[in-house]
């Protein structure tokens, strides 16, 4: 059976070594807290202003300020900073936390488009860090897609086999 990380690599086109190159240096020390706050604010401004109703609806039950805080705290923690997210919310458990949302290929690509644009606008992040971060984000987005697909497979209703008798389908209803 293929692991979710392996499936994420296949779906995203980013192998695990590239995805986790963010661990080779401490991006939090390099970039600082405010850079992550600015990135998440820029990103969620784009998300909440998205013209595509199907995408915007994914976030309709989420408070924008909470989403910004959750994201930048997770990024800070994941990229070498203090465990802000875990201190406030517990283990990140990304798949579980994203369970209520329709994390599809299309949604992941749209999310990544907004993140790429937010990164492109971030003058405080050097190009090498942007590339490493985007590879991590792409792999992680498709890790969530793989988790969502697995969840959907496990939640499919189990139907009892119908009678495969060819005569039953053509039999006239009795009155």
From Swiss-Prot:
The keyword Heme applies. It comes from the Eukaryota. Its cofactor is heme. Heme binds at residues 85, 98. Residues 153-175 are annotated as: Disordered. Binds 1 heme group per subunit. GO terms for molecular function: heme binding; metal ion binding; oxygen binding; oxygen carrier activity. CDD domains: TrHb2_AtGlb3-like_O. Pfam families: Bac_globin. Expressed ubiquitously, with higher levels in root tissue than in shoot tissue. Hemoglobin-like protein that exhibits an unusual concentration-independent binding of O(2) and CO. May promote shoot organogenesis from root explants in vitro. Inhibits RGLG3 and RGLG4 ubiquitination activity. This is Two-on-two hemoglobin-3. It comes from Arabidopsis thaliana (Mouse-ear cress). The lineage of its organism: Eukaryota, Viridiplantae, Streptophyta, Embryophyta, Tracheophyta.
């Amino acid at each position: 059976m293929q692991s979710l990380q392996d499936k994420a690599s296949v779906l995203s086109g980013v192998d695990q070594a590239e995805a986790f190159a963010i661990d080779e240096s401490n991006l939090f020390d390099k970039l600082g807290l405010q850079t992550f706050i600015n990135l998440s604010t820029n990103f969620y401004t784009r998300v909440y202003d998205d013209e595509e109703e199907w995408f915007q609806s994914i976030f309709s039950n989420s408070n924008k300020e909470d989403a910004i805080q959750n994201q930048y705290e997770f990024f800070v923690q994941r990229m070498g900073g203090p465990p802000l997210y875990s201190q406030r919310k517990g283990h990140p458990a990304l798949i579980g936390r994203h369970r209520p949302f329709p994390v599809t290929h299309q949604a992941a690509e749209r999310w990544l488009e907004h993140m790429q644009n937010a990164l492109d606008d971030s003058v405080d992040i050097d190009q090498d860090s942007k590339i490493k971060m985007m590879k991590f984000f792409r792999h992680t987005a498709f890790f969530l897609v793989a988790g969502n697909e697995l969840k959907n497979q496990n939640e499919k209703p189990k139907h009892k086999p119908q009678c495969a008798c060819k005569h039953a389908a053509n039999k006239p209803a009795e009155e």
